[in-house]
Design a protein with these regions (language model features):
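The substrate-binding groove and active-site-proximal loops of carbohydrate-active enzymes
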Residues: 358-365, 409-412, 440-444, 476-477, ...
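A generic structural motif
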Residues: 194-198, 263-265, 440-444, 476, ...
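Short, solvent-exposed loop/turn segments at the edges of secondary structure
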Residues: 125-127, 141, 319, 417, ...
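Exposed, low-structure sequence patches enriched in small/polar residues
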Residues: 369-371, 377, 448-450, 463-822
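Outer-membrane beta-barrel transmembrane domain signature of Gram-negative proteins
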Residues: 226-248, 396-463, 580-622, 643, ...
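Bacterial Sec-dependent N-terminal signal peptides
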Residues: 1-44, 822
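Structural preference for beta-rich elements and adjacent junctions enriched in aromatics
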Residues: 40-425, 436, 797
Length: 822
């Protein structure tokens, strides 16, 4: 009854907040009606139909070019937003029944000064570039980007309208291009097949279009249709491509079978060969939706995670690097309840609870085996976005061994598991939207179930100056009895103009838990957040542009309803005309009553107030040698605890193809205080005063053999140690009392050393050959090393190596059909 009463009180608290937000919104509407609305005429360009395909050779000599009217008069995005571009650009558009053709003349008064660096695919590096964004539905919600550098390096991006615009560089398409540098500048020709786009057969209307050109030596970014930098997002600030009509969407069907082989070795065991094979399939169900299926996937060649020593009560977050889960997954990010790294991650259960007398764990799998994954996603011409993602992993077993008899047996640490995510999203007027999403995890032969349902919305006014946004979610998880929790958030913001600001309130109950298929650091909290932001985008004095913000958070626990902390901070970012950048950020945290550091429900530790600041400086990245410096400092004024941290990064380009990067990071915390241990009954909680030192070295090298082949090497060593000096017992009032009876050694010395070397060759459109070498060594002990080189030698004692070759071949149904017809 007490919990229900507490929950009802929180609902009333949120209701009062909503009522306040409504009154604020009425005030905003009054302000809006008193102001002149921003209006901008969209540019248009006509696409001409052609009967003979253009030859993609970087020469604009076909007769069709004399008949077409080019798109021109580009304007600056940076540094002088809205003023004419420093160099003229003309772009021509054509189409036939299979593709859109783009021909562009990028004039340059100094062709020998064009930044013509060659890089790997999907990376412009520091090269000049030209690109087009095509929005077939002309709704300002989704656009397909095709970019090219003077060296012919292709970059394809899918931009999605969200809170701002998210550019998905993991999206890949198969298209043709050719560039050529002349005495007048450089020339681009593209052939973008309709199979790379999603559009409606019925709609003979204008498509959304914008073009971008970057001239590196001027640090100048330009667009065809004006993109007002005082307005959040760029997709809805597009022009129009007219004239495309009577086009039937092609069959979108492709297969990408792969074969791979691995030679793997670990110290103390024999090297073994592994062979894998599988298939990726993409099928356009209709004009709007695409099926993407992966059978028996192989992720053995992705870059190693940057592992770290984690002394916090929160799970470390690692970004997704598997292409299937990064490409075309923008819909599934609605609601914030999907974290794709859960799929195929480490087993959910441990074999410890299944051990019998005299048994030990002989082997435990580090990850579950994913056997297939399927996603269906798309958006209709009426603005309905629908996505379904499903994945399955096999049962995972640990091996336990009887130390007396030597007998071994398997213990299930995760049954056959099904993961499912479903989302429905509706685009509304003024680039607004509302979404509903559900995630579900079920295990066959196990009663455990986890289910989360969430909604998210953002409503903008006509001028897109103000917005109301919100989220809500309910989680239910368990086996025989289910634990249910709730999440709610509501905010109002002004996100247009030099001055922007916002306020929001969220509430997360103590039983809300989306982490079976999502990621949430902590629940059981209520946060009121307010912020104000100001930007100057026009150059003045020695400054090219600058911006700054001030923010404040008031955090309380949900249960019990007590203060957690109050934080106030700010940020200043300045870019100078010489392309140097300076950043300062800092915050002040009042006394914190931390209920998470203790690892025991209902217990808290009182952190003394502290402040922190960071200084960052980077030099001109256009130069062959560019540098980055960082210094950070944190201090508790009433105690002897403080922290110093620093970073140094250097990037060196040698010629047009070779680049070196070096990063050195160091962090030293003196007399830090944190959790160490607790007894079985959780009545005794041990903290320690400790010194924590961390050091990281990262060396990266990339060499472009051509615009279709590259070699990349990345080596990283991370070393972190925690030396406990004084042990304490946590008291009921959150204070500490020195404990002279605690004798266990809880020091930590952690090392992670990884090497990733990869040769990638795109030997045919959509096809690739990848050769990879991966080396990994990890060491975790309770004896703190003081000498760097002896510590590194000890780390290398337990290494694993993997040498692999993978061939993936792209087969397009339309190409096969065309060859058969011919």
């Amino acid at each position: 009854m007490q919990n229900k009463t507490l929950f009802i009180s929180k609902i009333l608290h949120l209701t009062v907040f909503i009522f306040t937000m409504k009154r604020l919104q009425l005030l905003f509407i009054t302000i809006i009606l008193s102001l002149a609305l921003f209006a901008q005429t969209k540019k248009t360009v006509q696409a001409l139909t052609i009967s003979t395909p253009l030859t993609i050779d970087g020469i604009l000599d076909e007769p069709a070019y004399k008949l077409a009217t080019p798109a021109k008069d580009f304007v600056q995005l940076q540094p002088h937003n809205g003023k004419p571009a420093m160099q003229p650009t003309e772009a021509y558009y054509f189409y036939d029944q299979s593709a859109i053709y783009v021909g562009a003349m990028l004039h340059d008064s100094a062709p020998d000064s064009i930044f013509n660096y060659m890089t790997e695919r999907d990376n412009t590096g520091m090269a000049d570039y030209f690109g087009v964004y095509i929005d077939p539905y002309n709704q300002g919600q989704l656009a397909y980007g095709f970019f090219i550098t003077p060296a012919g390096v292709q970059v394809d991006i899918k931009a999605v309208k969200s809170d701002g615009d998210n550019e998905d560089g993991n999206w890949n398409a198969v298209w043709e291009s050719k560039t050529r540098i002349t005495d007048k500048g450089w020339v681009v020709e593209m052939r973008i097949p309709f199979s790379a786009l999603r559009f409606s057969e019925k709609a003979n209307k204008a498509w959304g279009l914008n073009m971008f050109r970057n001239i590196r030596r001027y640090s100048s970014n330009n667009s065809w249709n004006l993109v007002d930098r005082n307005v959040s997002g760029f997709i809805h600030q597009e022009g129009q491509l007219e004239g495309i009509k009577d086009i039937k969407p092609p069959v979108r069907l492709s297969f990408s079978p792969y074969l791979s082989t691995y030679l793997e070795s670990k110290k103390g065991s024999k090297a073994e060969f592994l062979y894998k094979g599988g298939l990726d399939l993409k099928y356009g169900i209709n004009e709007s939706f695409t099926l993407d299926m992966m059978l028996i996937p192989d992720f053995g060649q992705i870059q190693s995670d940057d592992k770290k020593l984690n002394l916090s009560p929160y799970e470390l977050y690692y970004s997704e690097k598997r292409q299937f889960f990064t490409e075309g997954t923008e819909l599934f990010n609605r609601g914030g309840i999907f974290y794709s790294r859960r799929i195929g991650s480490s087993p959910k259960f441990s074999a410890d609870n299944s051990l019998r007398e005299n048994e030990v764990i002989d082997y435990s799998p580090s990850e579950t085996q994913l056997i297939n994954a399927t996603k269906i996603s798309g958006r209709t011409n009426k603005g309905w976005g629908i996505g379904v993602l499903n994945a399955m992993s096999l049962e995972s077993n640990a091996q336990v061994k009887d130390t007396l008899t030597g007998k071994e047996r398997n213990v299930s640490v995760q049954p056959f598991t099904n993961y499912n995510v479903t989302v429905v999203d509706k685009s509304l007027k003024n680039n607004s939207y509302v979404s509903l999403i559900n995630s579900n995890v079920s295990m066959f032969g196990n009663p455990f179930r986890a289910n989360v349902t969430a909604t998210e919305f953002q409503i903008r006014n006509k001028s897109k100056t103000y917005a109301i946004s919100g989220k809500g979610a309910i989680s239910s998880r368990g086996d025989s009895t289910y634990e249910t929790g709730y999440y709610a958030k509501l905010g109002v913001e002004k996100n247009k103009g030099k001055l922007q600001y916002g306020i929001s309130q969220n509430m997360i109950t103590d039983k809300y838990n989306p982490n079976d298929l999502g990621y949430l650091q902590r629940n059981n909290q209520m946060t009121t957040e307010a912020w104000i932001y100001y930007q100057i985008i026009e150059p003045f004095w020695i400054i090219r542009e600058c911006n700054g913000n001030i923010w404040s958070d008031h955090n309380r626990m949900y249960n019990p309803n007590t203060l957690y902390d109050n934080i106030t901070g700010g940020n200043l970012n300045v870019t100078f005309k010489n392309n140097y950048n300076f950043n300062f950020n800092g915050y002040y945290n009042m006394d914190r009553y931390d209920y998470y550091e203790t690892r025991v429900k209902g217990r808290f530790f009182k952190f003394a107030h502290f402040y922190s600041y960071n200084l960052n400086l980077s030099t001109d990245s256009r130069k062959p040698l560019s540098l980055y410096f960082h210094y950070g400092y944190a201090k508790q004024p009433t105690t002897d605890q403080y922290q110093n941290s620093g970073d140094f990064q250097a990037t060196m380009r040698l010629g047009q193809r070779l680049q070196f990067d070096y990063l050195f990071s160091i962090s030293n915390t003196t007399n830090g205080v944190g959790y160490v241990d607790k007894n079985d009954s959780e009545s005794s909680i041990t903290f320690a005063k400790r010194n924590v030192n961390s050091m990281e070295n990262v060396i990266s090298t990339s060499y472009a053999l051509s615009n279709k082949a590259s070699i990349n090497l990345r080596a990283r060593h991370y070393w972190s140690s925690a030396k406990n000096n004084i042990y304490y017992l946590l008291q009921q009032d959150g204070s500490l009392m020195e404990d002279l009876t605690y004798t266990e050694n809880k020091d930590q010395n952690y090392n992670a050393f990884t090497v990733d070397m990869m040769l990638k060759w795109n030997f045919a459109p959509g096809s690739e050959l990848v050769m990879a070498w991966k080396n990994a060594a990890f060491a975790d002990q309770n004896r703190v090393e003081t000498n760097y080189w002896s510590n590194l030698r000890n780390t290398w004692l337990n290494q694993s190596n993997s040498l692999s070759v993978k061939v993936l071949y792209y087969i397009d149904f339309n190409s096969l059909k065309k060859k058969k017809t011919t």
